[in-house]
From Swiss-Prot:
Lineage of the species this protein comes from: Archaea, Methanobacteriati, Methanobacteriota, Stenosarchaea group, Methanomicrobia
UniProt keyword annotations, A-Z: Nickel
Molecular function GO terms recorded: lyase activity; nickel cation binding
NCBIfam families, per the entry: nickel pincer cofactor biosynthesis protein LarC
Keyword match S-adenosyl-L-methionine: no
Alphabetized InterPro entries for the sequence: Ni_insertion (IPR002822)
Name of this protein: Putative nickel insertion protein
């Protein structure tokens, strides 16, 4: 089990992501073959040194005469390339992300009529297909991205002078919920292609997840900056047989809120995607009775859950403790059949294992067992025991 972490302290572009993944150990021959069979280009790889850091520089050599393609033309090219299914699915989604962002910015709802400019050229096609193939080649269980340095200032493009980040890039960041920051470099450091590739593959994190670095790679950018213009990537193995997970903890104190409101809030938060909810009694200043509401959430769900807490309780604010790394067992739901009093019933059981497949725990789904208990007349505790016993025989 391993994770890939991109650390874009100098931004990211398609060729930088491709070079980084190749430097981490992706199959160079396979990636080169896929790129050159999918687009009218050739690919060269060389080692360079950027301000003291050795990196891979990927050069996509394109025909002298290039023309802008429409989004449907790009889709047809990708589908005609006979790529591996995972690579094709990733490439199509990356181009869809760019198309939807361009459409939103330009007010063009019909993607069939959408013309790509820079991102519709052969080098962008090669970057997307190559990066998708290279990242899949690394066989990572998860991919993360720390806050992206987008640069600052303005850029010149087909639509004239635009601010950094470019509107389409900013829209991709918004939709992908990636963390980003401005930098003191008066230059575009994050391209739309780079943003779309990261939005497809990566979950946002503030810091590196806990673990051991097993490989480090650098992909070189074209421009010469004051610092090293490279994209850093790190392959990390968790220091455990459990599965790494990134969560945020939301917490607030609430007084003058009835039990009925708290009970409803509990259910609402879970239905909105909270991983877990705890409501604990507390005593506040001047001896006022109150409750502490604590929620475990995915980072991308925190804002909507915090708003729900404020709206439902009247709280003036919610504390967010970000990017906490927890280790969890790998869990999946299986359905099994059990025999009770001569009748056969079906129930779900939750199976927990570590990353090496060792069984850690089996628990029967309570709601299923409750229904079986009502039908069979067998106490629910006995139904759960029998279900877990049967599951242990099947899955141990």
């Amino acid at each position: 089990m391993k994770s890939l972490v991109f650390n874009p302290f100098s931004g990211a572009a398609g060729d930088m992501i491709l070079g980084c993944a190749l430097d981490l150990g992706a199959d160079r021959g396979e990636v080169k073959e896929l790129i050159e069979s999918s687009a009218p280009v050739s690919m060269d790889i060389r080692e360079v040194v950027k301000k003291g850091i050795k990196a891979l520089d990927v050069r996509i050599n394109v025909p002298e005469k290039e023309y802008f393609r429409t989004y449907p033309e790009i889709v047809d090219l990708v589908k005609a390339s006979k790529l591996p299914s995972k690579v094709e699915a990733s490439a199509l989604d990356i181009f869809l992300k760019m198309a939807e962002a361009e459409a939103a910015v330009h007010g063009q709802p019909d993607l069939e009529k959408l013309h790509f400019h820079e991102v519709g050229q052969s080098d962008a096609l090669a970057d997307v297909i190559g990066s998708s193939a290279a990242i899949h080649s690394l066989n990572c269980d998860s991919v993360y991205c720390t806050p992206i340095n987008v640069g600052s200032g303005t850029i010149e493009c087909a639509h004239g002078t635009l601010p950094v980040p470019a509107p389409a890039t900013l829209e991709i960041l918004r939709r992908g919920k990636l963390y980003f920051r401005g930098g003191n470099v008066n230059k575009e450091l994050l391209t739309p292609t780079g943003a779309a590739i990261l939005a497809h593959f990566a979950k946002p994190v503030d810091n590196f997840p806990q673990g051991r670095a097993v490989a480090i790679g650098y992909g070189a950018g074209d421009a010469e900056l004051q610092g090293p213009n490279v994209l850093q990537g790190v392959l990390i193995e968790p220091d455990s047989h459990l599965v790494p997970d990134i969560i945020e903890v939301l917490e607030t104190n609430a007084d003058d809120v009835s039990g009925e409101v708290l009970g409803n809030l509990f259910e609402e938060l879970l239905s909105m995607g909270a991983r877990d909810v705890a409501i604990m009694p507390a005593t506040m200043k001047k001896g006022r009775p109150a409750h502490i509401i604590k929620v475990i959430a995915k980072p991308e769900d925190s804002a909507k859950l915090a708003r729900k807490i404020i709206v439902e309780t009247g709280s003036l604010g919610v504390r967010v403790m970000p990017a906490r790394h927890r280790l969890t067992a790998s869990r999946n739901i299986e359905r099994i059949k059990i025999d009770l009093e001569g009748q056969e019933f079906e129930t779900a059981v939750k199976i927990a294992r570590d990353s090496e497949g060792v069984l850690l725990n089996i628990s029967a789904e309570f709601e299923d067992c409750k229904k079986i208990a009502k039908t069979s007349g067998v106490p629910v505790r006995e139904v759960m025991r029998r279900a877990e016993e049967a599951a242990r025989k099947l899955f141990s």
